A protein has these predicted regions:
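Extended C-terminal subregions enriched in glycine
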Residues: 470, 490-491, 524-525, 533-582
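Short, low-complexity, Lys/Arg-enriched N-terminal segments of secretory-pathway carbohydrate enzymes
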Residues: 1-26
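Internal maturation/activation junctions in enzymes
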Residues: 59-63, 241, 245, 252, ...
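Active-site rim segments in enzyme catalytic domains, especially the processed small/beta chain
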Residues: 116-120, 126-133, 137-141, 290-291, ...
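Short beta-strand scaffold segments in enzyme catalytic cores
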Residues: 122, 126-134, 425-430, 498-500, ...
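Single-pass alpha-helical transmembrane segments
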Residues: 31-44
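Noncatalytic scaffold domains of N-terminal-nucleophile
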Residues: 25-27, 42, 46-95, 99-265, ...
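Short, small/polar residue-rich loop motifs at catalytic or cofactor-binding pockets
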Residues: 302, 421-424, 446, 494-496
Length: 613
């Protein structure tokens, strides 16, 4: 499998290393970062969630001129870097590296932190995909800890009651987060297990600050805002309102106790120890069908990733299905032979044409996605080899009409439709020994299934909503994808695609991934294209307003910032357009060359990067 070189265009990352000669002190950088995060988060909330005097959403027109760069920082480091959705979690991961922890150690420590400080998106009640690269071996691995359907699940269990797949006790898959972390730690961990959890346990004493994102989500998430444990943590009884951003709150005592037991007894205790007994009691009381055997029998998979050779000798590593790594590769394969460069987006006509081609590639790739599912239940080896091959990409590219689009999903090869997925958080890590980790984790919808378990204090996922169910024909007359139907022990298809690019000498070049549900795959593709083909810095690539097309519904979703003339150009080719008002996708990317590591955390969520010089 070969894709045209994605690194032929020199970027401004490569040209500007002046900040290496006079680095800021870490404390100063953290203070500045926090101030910037608060400023941006407040501005975004006021923009995206702003209300008119009458209480109706305000919708400013699409801009005529391009937006100014965000206030996020383009960081440079000499040795190592950790990028997360929260500055404190990045610092925790960096501190683990400074203690001679491995890249996996740093990732696990940041995951536990993110599971608290971004508890609306991920946590120990969810699951993940992880790509690990070990420099000494010159080899990459995929860790698949996606949640599984309980043994008592049936293909039609949500017939006539689809909301039960999204909220409440029947929405849970068997959580894989902790067993997946434990499996990765057993193989690549270096520091004591408890030391990876202690920095997060410290928040049980000191408390943590409510982020803008957490505040936004708790105020709108159905059911979750009424949960007694979440309200005890996040609700101010004096004002009768949720605590505003910046307020210091403490985690629940139940959650702190659970985390302490995991630290003391190891990751398996949640699956076959005292915590497992308590969790099953919680779930039975709530009405879940997850059993003690479901927990005991859950296994995280350590397997080979999809490995795609680039024409210059670089290699892209990304997880196999049920992740969307194959979809990402398919997008890049389709676009590879266009030989995009910085000139491809110079001038209005070129920019419109290039975006049109990218959007068409998205549509073809999301048709491919409708046939993907859990490879433990489907033999997809031949299909994956085909859709990730250069020849398949060329054949699809030849079908793209530069002048007009189609609004028929069947035209692009869709034989069914896929469910949307939601939520997620991403972590990217580069260690000073050359190892790297790209990790995307999720509890699916904001605050998962909308409640916290009584004894164990865990926010459980609602991953069952990511499965397709028979009998729901969409507006195009397409049936849901059978590849993603529910079966006991099966993992649902996901948009997550944590990826690592390594050069021909075995050195990590790019660690990238995203949060944002169904928009994840296109966001990763867009940022990679902008960085590696258009020659932008990682900050420029992440800052740029993004667009997304998932074939169904038949519209380009775009965020504020795409200019009116570009949108008019796309509409003239027959595209429908819809502007979304939420944060969309959130990207964390680390890029390394011979000079430095260049890193940026997406301004849309207020994360940051910490590193070592």
């Amino acid at each position: 499998m070969t894709i045209r070189s994605m690194t032929v265009t020199e970027s401004r990352d490569d040209k500007d290393s002046s900040c290496l000669n006079g680095p800021y002190k870490l404390k100063t950088k953290l203070i500045i970062s926090v101030l910037i995060v608060l400023f941006i988060a407040g501005g975004l909330t006021g923009y995206f969630l702003g209300l008119t005097d009458k209480g109706k959403p305000s919708e400013p027109p699409d801009p005529v001129l391009r937006l100014r760069p965000s206030a996020s920082l383009l960081h440079t480091f000499k040795k190592a870097a950790v990028c997360t959705d929260n500055p404190a979690c990045s610092e925790i991961g960096r501190n683990i590296l400074q203690q001679n922890g491995s890249a996996v150690d740093a990732t696990i420590a940041a995951m536990f932190c993110n599971g608290l400080l971004n508890q609306q998106s991920m946590g120990i009640g969810g699951g993940f995909f992880m790509t690990v690269y070990i420099r000494e071996e010159g080899k990459a691995y995929s860790v698949i800890a996606r949640e599984t359907a309980p043994a008592g699940a049936t293909v039609d269990m949500y017939s006539g009651q689809p909301d039960k797949a999204r909220f409440g006790p029947l929405a849970h898959g068997v959580p894989g987060e902790v067993r997946g972390m434990w499996a990765a730690y057993q193989r690549w961990g270096r520091l004591p297990w408890a030391s990876l959890i202690q920095p997060t346990l410290d928040f049980c004493e000191t408390g943590f600050n409510v982020s803008q994102v957490m505040y936004d989500m708790i105020t709108v998430a159905p059911y979750a805002k009424d949960d007694p444990i979440l309200r005890r943590q996040l609700f101010d009884t004096k004002t009768n309102k949720f605590h505003p951003p910046g307020t210091t709150v403490k985690p629940s005592a139940e959650w702190c106790r659970t985390l302490k037991i995991i630290a003391e007894k190891g990751g398996d205790d949640l699956y076959n120890g005292t915590l497992a007994v308590e969790l099953i009691d919680d779930l039975k009381k709530a009405g879940s069908i997850i059993t003690a055997d479901d927990l005991k029998n859950y296994k995280a998979k350590v397997t080979d990733p999809i490995a795609v050779k680039l024409a210059n000798g670089d290699t892209l590593y990304t997880p196999p299905p049920p992740s969307s790594g194959a979809v990402l590769v398919n997008i890049l394969n389709i676009l590879s032979s266009y030989n995009f460069t910085a000139d491809s987006i110079k001038g209005l006509d070129n920019e419109v044409l290039t975006y049109h081609r990218i959007i068409e590639a998205f549509k073809y790739a999301y048709a491919v996605r409708t046939k993907l599912g859990d490879t433990d239940f489907l033999d997809l080896r031949e299909y994956i080899a085909n859709i990730t091959s250069p020849q398949f990409g060329i054949e699809v590219r030849q079908k793209i009409n530069d002048n007009v689009t189609s609004n028929d999903p069947v035209y692009y090869g869709a034989e069914g439709y896929s469910k949307d997925d939601h939520g997620t958080a991403h972590i990217s890590v580069m260690a000073d020994n050359g190892d790297a980790v790209s990790l995307t984790s999720s509890i699916n919808y904001y605050f998962g299934a909308g409640y916290v378990t009584e004894k164990t204090g865990i926010i459980l996922n609602d991953v069952m909503d990511d499965f397709s169910s028979p009998g729901f024909t969409n507006q195009f007359g397409l049936q849901p994808s059978p590849a993603n139907f529910i079966a006991p022990g099966k993992r649902p298809q996901s948009s997550m695609c944590p990826s690592i690019i390594v050069d021909k000498d075995g050195n990590v070049r790019l660690v990238i991934g995203a949060a944002g549900g169904t928009k994840i795959t296109t966001a990763v593709a867009l940022v990679a294209i902008r960085k590696l083909w258009f020659g932008e810095t990682v900050k420029e690539a992440i800052d740029h307003p993004r667009f997304h097309h998932q074939l169904i519904p038949m519209t380009i979703y775009y965020e504020f910032g795409l200019t009116q003339d570009i949108l008019d150009g796309l509409r003239s080719k027959g595209h429908n357009t819809t502007r979304y008002r939420d944060r969309g996708s959130i990207v964390c990317a680390l890029y390394k060359n011979k000079t430095a590591i260049y890193a940026n955390s997406d301004f849309r969520k207020g994360g940051d990067v910490a590193g070592m010089d």
